[in-house]
Amino acid sequence: MTEPFTPPHRLSAWSTLENHAARLRTMRIAELFEHDAARFATLSFGHRGLLLDLSKQSIDAPALAALVDLAGQARLPDGIEALFAGEHLNFTEDRAVLHMALRGACAAPLEDAATLAQSQQRMRAFTVALRSGTMTGATGKPIRLVVNLGIGGSDLGPRMAAQALVPTGLRATPEVRFVANIDRRELDEALADADPASTLFVVSSKSFATAETLANAQAARAWLQAGLGAGCDPALHFTAVSNATDAAAAFGIPAERVFPLPEWVGGRYSVWSTIGLPLMIAIGASEFDAFLAGARAMDEHFRTAPPGENLPVLMGLAGLWNTDFLGIESLALLPYAHGLRSFAAWLQQLEMESNGKRCLRDGSGSVIHTSPIVWGGVGTVGQHAFHQLFYQGTRRVALDFIVPVAAADDVSQRSLVENAFAQSAALMSGRDLDTALASLRAKGLAESEAAVLAPHLVCPGNQPSTTVLLPALDAFSLGQLMALYEHKVFVQGWIWGINSFDQYGVELGKEMARSLSAGSGENHDASTAGLMAAAEAMRRTPDRS
């Protein structure tokens, strides 16, 4: 994109939105329902079974129209088309951003098309061999356990999706486990009941140079060598997803067991690529196809639907509204499904690594806020932990409820759905002092006692929330959901004017870690140098006196 860039706060729609925000800050969300009986119908949107409800946001139709106008002034439709056309929107690294091509929603670059098709075929053949029991290790035993060694995008997406799609209590063959932390305890736990002769490790590192992943791979190799004994080749117990075939070969993984991935696939968008190999192994090739199909359906909707009917666009605009016009600094993800227990961790990387930036496309610094702080946890567990802050804390928090509906006869899921709806309603409506007093009087408390206790029962409410309803937590719906959030993040990054596809802050942290690993205390601040010295002293002589 070569057109001049205008920061969003300088667009005319921005001042219009500031006026809407001043008006809506004085109104409660519950009042908006009183003024508009058709509010749910107006502010809920569907596509291929997925429902996006924005009616509990602190927004109304005129404000939403102004947000859509902002998207137009920011040339978002041009940005969407540039994304799908393969323009180098990751301009700092001079790369296209084409993870949608992995799902069949757009064409891969011609020079990569053949390699991509071959890799996908190899993934399928590898998966079939593992799941059928025909792939064996060095001793001839079939592989029964696959352990993925990766971190960041090489772990979060496949791990989250496997948790969501492998039914609880079903012991898949082979079983797939994930190890990311350099803390040896995670690897030890993954291997506690494992048989080296029937265990396969997938080393997932695009560069085959990720420090944490290589450390775990080396520990895994030592474990295999100790367990298999002399004369057994541990290479039969490794495969890699990487572009560094020479580095993988130096480690002991032959080229025929290395699955490459295109350079235009960023880590946090890589579950759709060969990085998704452990997911395909866990759920099977046909379910992986359904996963891709769900994402492709959302891709096609994002590319073709008008902004005012486009789910990722509307979701992104609602989030931008909360961040920049209502001053809400955090987004809590509340999936009401145990299978989505790692969804918040996946979204943390997607949102905060993509949009946690301040440098704009023209090199200037942003004067408005970008990514919110993303956190959360699974319902109903969170209701007994951090939901208290939503009800009676001093901050407004934006909330995303993700609710798979499932079958009508699933009693536990029906209860989860009811709890999710109750939470979103209660957090919107709250409880005022008069209601609190009335409830205490009804319980028989004396007026003096009720007057003392009632203020402690007041819940301000007015917490804005989005609800995403899924027909079920299946492969197609999960693909839709993940692509919805991916494109939402693009929408926000585009309007803010940042590059959502690099992560130079992460690289600075890696550089510092390498410096400390080299053992040099020079050129470090006094605190860091002091901590290094204290840690070394503790290693030598722990003082517990």
Swiss-Prot record:
Major subcellular site: cytoplasm
Keywords per UniProt = Cytoplasm, Gluconeogenesis, Glycolysis, Isomerase
Instruction: Give its localization.
Output: Cytoplasm
Recorded GO MF terms: carbohydrate derivative binding; glucose-6-phosphate isomerase activity; monosaccharide binding
Q: Where does the signal sequence lie?
A: none
Keyword Cytoplasm (UniProt) = yes
- Biological or metabolic pathway of the protein: Carbohydrate biosynthesis; gluconeogenesis; Carbohydrate degradation; glycolysis; D-glyceraldehyde 3-phosphate and glycerone phosphate from D-glucose: step 2/4
Please list the GO biological process terms of this entry. gluconeogenesis; glucose 6-phosphate metabolic process; glycolytic process
Name the reaction it catalyses.
Answer: alpha-D-glucose 6-phosphate = beta-D-fructose 6-phosphate
Highest taxon listed in the record's lineage = Bacteria
Q: Which GO terms describe its cellular component?
A: cytosol
- InterPro entries referenced in this protein's UniProt entry, alphabetically: G6P_Isomerase (IPR001672), G6P_Isomerase_C (IPR023096), Phosphoglucose_isomerase_CS (IPR018189), SIS_dom_sf (IPR046348), SIS_PGI_1 (IPR035476), SIS_PGI_2 (IPR035482)
Catalytic residues, per the record, are 353 (proton donor), 384, 510
Please state what class of enzyme this protein is: isomerase
The Enzyme Commission number assigned here is 5.3.1.9
The Swiss-Prot or TrEMBL record describes its family as follows: Belongs to the GPI family.
Role: Catalyzes the reversible isomerization of glucose-6-phosphate to fructose-6-phosphate.
Query: What name does the UniProt record give this protein?
Result: Glucose-6-phosphate isomerase
Which gene produces this protein? Answer: pgi
